């Protein structure tokens, strides 16, 4: 038996042990996590045994397939979803440099967001214009967005499809911004596999981003993707990812004398430097993942349809079990004309309720049910954002309540209906006051 086959047999044994449903009351029911079997382990081992760790053929295929899953043509694999947002806005800023000015630099963004959907806006010199979100869908408040889009100082919009619930007005926002010479970036980190108007999330935007962190719909361990419809945009993004380098060759052929393009020493830049492998056109970063992550991601993509089905089935089942407590809480729902790909099950305690989030989450955690808040909730409530807290003209009352009263539990494929029913039973017991 060859060493490679022997290793794969051991990996297969471990992989089968890895994928088990939690036992309610005995094992932790996570809010999310990776769903693996032996195929992911084998894909990773193949890359390790091949000996090429840098980005190569697996990464290029992963970029292409992920881009198509987000309604785009070209992808750039990066080391996280947060990096994807940064690279997306860096690329857009370069492309829209003639339209951005001191009097037109505001970017619309929901106040209830993940921090790194907001942070690149601030870090790259734009001014965030915060809008509120709706209870239930957690989408940006439509009237506020429309009012903001009519302002002369707005250049763009950046938002996440909240917790796997596509924003149905995305196409409308994109068309308004496009007509006005502005841009839209869709953060699809929580919504891979979701659709609006029967097309994938990511379709109606100038750039779409994704996270492949372990908690998300597919995983590569860590990782992210930024996707575009034009090759030029992909090359700009790759340059920002790869230290600002002008060369876009990739794969094992970069080790050849003339590079993967065969023109390494062709002097195509007029600066008296003949080796274009080391020409830097931008102030870039090192945001590269590795080939092994792409190999895992490709296997996960093949399972996406099943993952989405499991998430949505778990979500629907939990919702049916909790319908009796709608007087106390806002339960989540999707808008008409969208197909969700639920990341989690968010619950917001109503303002008039005597319940508290602390009571619910501490009680659930004591029963081995993992909970999370709605990420940052209203980001403006956090210390890092205090200096920009006065930058919005709109009421953020819903985001304020989400900051204090919203939590979420899991619906991911790693839990089954038995776990879902255990979650529901415990929530109902707490709400009824019978938490024994």
List each model region and its residues.
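Active-site phosphate-binding strand-loop segment of PLP-dependent enzymes
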Residues: 136-220, 225-235, 408, 412
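N-terminal "arm"/small-domain region of PLP-dependent enzymes with the aminotransferase-like
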Residues: 1-53, 182, 281, 410
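Helix C-cap/helix->beta junction micro-motif
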Residues: 124, 179-181, 367
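PLP-dependent aminotransferase class I/II
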Residues: 59-64, 72-73, 81, 101, ...
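Phosphate-binding glycine-rich loop
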Residues: 57-106, 120-123, 130
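Conserved coil-to-alpha-helix start sites within the AMP-binding
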Residues: 112-118
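Short beta-strand->loop structural element characteristic of the AMP-binding/adenylate-forming
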Residues: 117, 127-137, 372
């Amino acid at each position: 038996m060859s060493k490679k086959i022997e290793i794969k047999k051991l990996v297969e044994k471990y992989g089968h042990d890895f994928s088990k449903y939690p036992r309610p009351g005995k094992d932790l029911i996570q809010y999310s996590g990776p769903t693996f079997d032996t195929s992911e382990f084998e894909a990773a081992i193949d890359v390790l045994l091949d000996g090429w760790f840098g980005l190569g053929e697996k990464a290029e295929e992963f970029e292409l397939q992920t881009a198509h899953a987000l309604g785009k043509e070209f992808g750039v694999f990066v080391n996280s979803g947060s990096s994807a947002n940064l690279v997306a806005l860096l690329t857009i800023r370069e492309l829209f440099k003639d339209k951005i000015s001191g009097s037109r630099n505001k970017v619309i963004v929901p106040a209830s967001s993940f921090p790194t959907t907001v942070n690149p806006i601030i870090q790259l010199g734009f001014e965030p214009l915060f809008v509120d979100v709706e209870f239930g869908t957690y989408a940006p408040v439509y009237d506020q967005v429309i009012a903001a889009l009519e302002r002369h100082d707005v250049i763009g919009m950046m938002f996440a499809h909240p917790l796997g619930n596509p924003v149905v007005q995305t196409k409308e926002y994109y068309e308004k911004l496009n007509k006005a010479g502005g841009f839209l970036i869709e953060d699809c980190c929580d919504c891979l596999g979701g659709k609006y108007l029967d097309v994938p999330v990511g379709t109606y935007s100038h750039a779409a981003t994704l996270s492949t962190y372990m908690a998300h719909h597919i995983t590569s361990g860590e990782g992210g993707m930024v996707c575009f419809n034009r090759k030029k945009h992909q090359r700009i993004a790759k340059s920002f990812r790869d230290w600002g380098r002008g060369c876009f060759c990739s794969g094992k052929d970069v080790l050849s004398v003339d590079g993967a393009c065969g023109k390494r020493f062709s002097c195509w830049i007029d600066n008296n430097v003949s080796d274009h492998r080391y020409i830097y056109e931008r102030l870039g970063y090192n945001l590269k993942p590795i080939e092994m992550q792409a190999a895992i991601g490709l296997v996960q993509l093949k399972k996406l349809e099943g993952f989405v089905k499991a998430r949505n089935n778990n979500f629907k089942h939990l919702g049916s079990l909790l319908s009796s407590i709608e007087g106390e809480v806002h339960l989540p729902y999707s808008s008409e004309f969208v197909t969700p790909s639920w990341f989690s099950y968010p619950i917001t305690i109503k303002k008039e309720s005597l319940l508290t989030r602390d009571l619910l989450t501490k009680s659930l955690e004591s029963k081995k049910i993992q909970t999370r808040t709605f990420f940052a909730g209203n980001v403006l409530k956090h210390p890092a954002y205090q200096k920009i807290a006065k930058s919005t003209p709109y009421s953020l009352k819903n985001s304020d309540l989400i900051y204090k009263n919203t939590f979420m539990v899991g619906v991911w494929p790693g839990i089954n209906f038995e776990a879902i029913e255990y979650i529901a039973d415990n929530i109902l017991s707490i709400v009824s006051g019978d938490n024994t």
